[in-house]
Amino acid sequence: QHVDCLETGDYDNMSDEEVLEQLHVIDDRRIYLIAEILRRGIASYDRIHEVTMIDEWFIDKIAILVEMEKKIKACGGKLDKELLKEAKRMEFPDNVIARWTGKTEEEIKNLRYEYGITAAFKMVDTCAAEFASETPYYYSCFDGENEVEDNHERKKIMVLGSGPIRIGQGIEFDYCSVHSVWALSQEGYETIIVNNNPETVSTDFDIAD
């Protein structure tokens, strides 16, 4: 998922007919529009596919997210362990779950900890299973076992990256991240870089430890 959610509020004041008419407009907000149509139940997969030519496989994935959204809203703030665990497995952020249940983000985080629902870090397979490889390159998720091996022998420093490169922004922020890591490594620290842009140099598996 990794947008906050598929609910934008842009279509709240639009009738069903207006929403369906908007489906003919090709723009970057179509995913939100499709979610709204599925939320209202005003068009079938076949109809959405016929207008947009988006494969029904993708439409079904959007529908799964919308169904989870409905379940969270319908729980009346009484989030049980299984519902919260499934919502986090599907990558719904704490702040969104909080908004839909009338709680604060801090309350959702504390509830997760109470239920033992925390992120795991899985190793990225940089060779796509073509042959065995181990790289210090991990992604976080709420599904599966943690694959990070603890190393308590060296002092560690975490460098926070600047995230995706925005339009009009240069690469100077990523340049700073990389050179920070290199300088800290030369001083003997074990370096950990946290970023959410897989296309930058700072997230190359051989930059940090």
Task: Describe the predicted segments one by one.
Residues 1-208:
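ATP-dependent carboxylate/acyl-activation modules
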